[in-house]
Curated annotation (Swiss-Prot):
Function: Cleaves both 3' and 5' ssDNA extremities of branched DNA structures.
GO molecular function, one term: single-stranded DNA endodeoxyribonuclease activity
Family: Belongs to the NucS endonuclease family.
Protein name per UniProt: Endonuclease NucS
Entry's Gene Ontology cellular component terms: cytoplasm
Any matching Pfam family: NucS_N
Subcellular location: Cytoplasm
Domain of life: Bacteria
Length: 220
């Protein structure tokens, strides 16, 4: 939707976006994001799933109130709608991993003890409604752990793992599910975001992992 609107965030802090033309995205996973023309792919404000949208018609202009389970709210007051359309994009196949990233996943599945003593592999490419989790593991106490593997660990990867964790933790068989963000190099901003969300970061030494004993790449 493209609309003239104001946006207010109410939660751990407050933020206000004055009236302007903006792009509003309401995705099938429940997320809502507010975009302008000058920030590339980054939204001005957003609410990640799980969250719920209700309409408030009590004021002079209709407003959508998006609230997450923590009680934080994104209030979008619509003054004028310029464009409104709905599209079903279907199931996305996801990113195709490059050679190094795919190899990292294979190696870590074989050397899952690098994540911690007592870790065991449950499944590679554990499928969810929003895409496959790279590795689903059990820790030394039998708890579920979702692992996202990247060559370069950036904020997008942390956001991706956050979405997986939100979905997996709705599964009473798996919950509680913790997250591990594993990469060759993890940017400071991504590490800070992961830590803030309770996700553990693990730096992978690709060269060392390739030098370890691997059933797939053993010649004899």
């Amino acid at each position: 939707m493209i609309a003239q609107c104001t946006v207010d965030y109410l939660g751990r802090l407050t933020a206000h976006l004055p009236s302007a033309r903006r792009l509003l995205l309401f995705k099938a996973d429940g997320s809502v994001s507010v975009h302008a023309d000058d920030r590339a792919y980054k939204p001005l404000n957003w609410m990640s799933p799980p969250c719920w949208l209700t309409e408030d018609v009590a004021g002079a202009s209709p407003a959508w109130v998006v609230e997450n389970k923590a009680g934080e709210q994104l209030r979008i007051t619509v003054e004028e709608v310029e464009h409104d359309s709905c599209h079903d994009l279907g199931v996305d196949p996801g990113l195709v991993k490059d050679g190094v990233e795919a190899h990292l996943q294979t190696l870590l599945a074989e050397q899952v003890q690098l994540l911690g003593e007592g870790y065991t592999l449950v499944r590679c490419e554990y499928m969810t409604a929003i895409g496959p989790v790279d590795l689903l593991c059990r820790d030394e106490q039998g708890g579920s752990v979702a692992v996202e593997i990247k060559r370069r660990g950036e904020i997008d990867g942390v956001e991706q793992l956050t979405r997986y964790l939100a979905l997996l933790n709705r599964n009473s068989v798996l919950a509680p599910v913790r997250g591990v963000f594993a990469a060759q190099h993890i940017k400071p901003q991504a590490r800070t975001l992961a830590t803030d969300r309770g996700i553990r970061c693990v730096t992978l030494d690709y060269d060392k992992m390739r030098g370890m004993d691997s059933d797939e790449y053993r010649l004899f």
